[in-house]
Amino acid sequence: EHGYLLNKYTGCKVWCVINNEECGYLCNKRRGGYYGYCYFWKLACYCQGARKSELWNYKTNKCDL
C-alpha cells in the first residue's frame, strides 16, 4: 500500500517539513515500507509499500488537532 504514515497516538498524519531522512527511516525501518519521503505540499510523510494499518485514511480519520 502507499499513503501518508499514521501517527497512532493522535490519529493524524505524521507531519514533516523537509525531512526526507526521518520519513524514510519511519517508512523503511519502522513501518515495513520500501520508500518514504516528506511530501512538501501536504507537510506529511508519504510511504510506499507499508501495511495498510500503518497508513492514514481519510474515511477512518480520527485526527482531532
Swiss-Prot record:
Localization annotation: Secreted
InterPro entries according to UniProt: LCN-type_CS_alpha_beta_dom, Scorpion_toxin-like, Scorpion_toxin-like_sf, Scorpion_toxinL/defensin
Cystine residue pairs: 12-63, 16-38, 23-45, 27-47
Coiled coil segments of this chain: none
Keyword DNA-binding: no
GO process annotations (BP): defense response
Family: Belongs to the long (4 C-C) scorpion toxin superfamily. Sodium channel inhibitor family.
Name listed for the protein in its UniProt record: Toxin AaHIT4
Organism annotation: Androctonus australis
Lineage: Eukaryota, Metazoa, Ecdysozoa, Arthropoda, Chelicerata
